[in-house]
């Protein structure tokens, strides 16, 4: 009679469960990768997404699509996080990183079926990923930030897969100029928060323009007849209200005769006039007022006094804009009128309201860089909100590509060329290895071919023929041979100016390998109470 096994021990001996859990995890993650696979490359399709609030989005940006998808499986959510990590690190390649993760999980599934331990697979994948990064850096070409043409080509490649691809010759130089105006040859990074993208419906994408300064969507208050243009501006950014104070509790004041009424109005006038004179005394002539939900940020009487004192008033500045405006205008936010002093003001050559395609915007130009940080604004135009949102996302991707080149000044050919080259190198090196590692590296090498295969499929080409042709061209030493959709076949993509920053590819492979390692190490899912 066999010995009795306790319940906990039986669970430990049951080897089926971890395998089933891993299989379920891999299926869930690959389903996410397959869902966005058709949106890769210049001929990739767009997805229409209806959000929970009923808004419509049209995009082929991997991170945008995944962020909006209702994903319930916890492992599938890890792919959304990988896409988000790629978006914050490189800004581009968000679809590629998810497809690559899906392909590596497919390779891992085959290896698990052969009985190879998941930890060995995960660690071998990471070593292969590190080797892939070395190969990519080896085949990249160094560039200088002075070489504007190369930067424009890299930005154009990023825009080629978007709805706005026909405007890439216009938007790519715009993105390059925005980033270069904030950097110099010694810069190692650029903060994209210093580039303000302002969306305005109206006009076409061609009307998108860059402004060397700050653009505000709020209008100048004209109801009291104050100025709408100010040269040699001294700008104050206030967080207090210029209106009569309200009691903390709900109180009623009973007025018996007109003398008391007159006294209340006199008090109010004196209170507001004192605040306005204090502002004028500090030599402030442009006033930005934060939006208030408790009471009027500025009332009609205060506007009348400010217009008489020749002060431009812009009200309803959002709370989340305060930090940006403070940084870019060089002025400190003022929370109390007693703290309103000249040293807290920012300076600019000109503040004016202009009419742009039927909408009014406020431009602040010629900002004096004392303690101000250099910033640029970009007014994004589009026929409707759907086009406008996608234009903004596309422009952000192009800006991220240039930021990648500021961080790591090296370009590689696009169109699947780096993946084929890395795949070939890893496959060759795996033949010299012993044991299980050789198997794992071979599967890793084959998985990398998913990028050129998908590019060819989405372009309507014969993927088997194209990938086979690329392999033979790389074997004969053409390291930059990739897929050109324009030529409907293989070509030297570097000479065709299909370029991408090396950081996009290195980041994608590293993140994909790390994500696969995390997924393979999970052998059970339990739910907490």
UniProtKB/Swiss-Prot annotation:
Q: Which domain of life is it from?
A: Eukaryota
Q: Which InterPro entries match?
A: Chap_CCT_delta, Chaperone_TCP-1, Chaperonin_TCP-1_CS, Cpn60/GroEL/TCP-1, GroEL-like_apical_dom_sf, GROEL-like_equatorial_sf, TCP-1-like_intermed_sf, TCP-1_chaperonin
Q: Gene Ontology cellular component?
A: chaperonin-containing T-complex
Q: What is its main location?
A: cytoplasm
Any matching Pfam family: Cpn60_TCP1
List the GO biological process terms: chaperone mediated protein folding independent of cofactor; protein folding
Keywords from the named record: ATP-binding, Chaperone, Cytoplasm, Nucleotide-binding
Q: Which family does it belong to?
A: Belongs to the TCP-1 chaperonin family.
Q: Report the protein name in the record.
A: T-complex protein 1 subunit delta
* Species this protein is from: Eremothecium gossypii (strain ATCC 10895 / CBS 109.51 / FGSC 9923 / NRRL Y-1056) (Yeast)
Upper lineage: Eukaryota, Fungi, Dikarya, Ascomycota, Saccharomycotina
**Encoding gene, per UniProt annotation:** CCT4
